[in-house]
């Protein structure tokens, strides 16, 4: 019994580098299987699939999700700061600067 093969990409972006790996995998493969097969975990040992979230075309998915032909599997880095907190601080700084004018 042969399984249909599909084309996918595994992507990991760093601040100054983006790694895109193109693979041909069995259609039945899960996101986790594809990531492990890609070799990206060896290239970037800081990736921890129990910590890093993953997605397909900017939509979060679970590691056991199935993929479709031409899907882009993205491995997300953990946020270093809370976006709400950053916006709040910027607003405070802008308000303080406006009050000094």
Curated annotation (Swiss-Prot):
InterPro entries: Mopterin_synth/thiamin_S_b, RnfH, RnfH_sf
Membrane-spanning parts: none
NCBIfam families reported in the protein's UniProt record: PRK01777.1 (NF002490)
Family, per entry: Belongs to the UPF0125 (RnfH) family.
HAMAP family: UPF0125_RnfH
PANTHER family: UPF0125 PROTEIN RATB
Name of protein: UPF0125 protein VC_0850
Source species: Vibrio cholerae serotype O1 (strain ATCC 39315 / El Tor Inaba N16961)
């Amino acid at each position: 019994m042969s399984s249909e093969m599909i084309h996918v990409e595994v992507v990991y972006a760093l601040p100054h580098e983006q790694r895109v790996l193109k693979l041909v995998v069995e259609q039945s493969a899960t996101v986790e299987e594809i990531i492990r097969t890609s070799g990206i975990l060896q290239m970037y040992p800081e990736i921890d699939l129990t910590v890093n979230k993953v997605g397909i075309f900017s939509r979060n998915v679970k590691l056991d999700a199935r993929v479709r032909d031409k899907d882009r599997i993205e491995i997300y880095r953990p946020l270093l700061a809370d976006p709400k907190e950053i916006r709040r601080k910027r607003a405070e700084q802008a308000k303080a600067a406006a009050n000094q004018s």
